[in-house]
Amino acid sequence: MEDFPPGTDLTAHPNDAFFKAIFSEPEQAAAFFKSHLPATIADRIDWPTLAVVPASFVKSSLQQVHSDLLFSVTLAGRETLLYLLFEHQSTVDPTLPLRLLGYVGEILTQQHKSHGLPLPPVMPFVLHQGPDHWNVSTDFEDLFELPDDIAEDLLPFLPKFHHALLD
């Protein structure tokens, strides 16, 4: 089972503790992903290679950042690595795409430092278990307010980023 960040009060976050306890087991995570990822992706994954990898990052500001769970897996018949970033949310957070983009950036930076190019894809997946339905966008570009008359010209310069969501 994955360790929680030092100083984490597990009783203050029982849903997160339960989520991590269950899904840090590769067999449980694989069963979940197989039934919730798009079939075109799930069918290409070599599931026995699914492994939990460290999900803590030290930013350049020396601030430690923790995502919930991170898995690596290879695609069937290839040496291509795929990361599955698994985040648990109990509240609706309109800024979640920004936080996820930060995690993806840290994962790719670490990957580049240790293995160079090409970079592996990182697929963020959010499991929302809260009292309210998820009613905010899962697309990063929707965090921006773009003037109608130049939005089309600005869009190519914004990061294109989306996260999968199970509400």
Set out the residue ranges of the language-model regions.
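Accessory alpha/beta interaction modules
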Residues: M1-D167
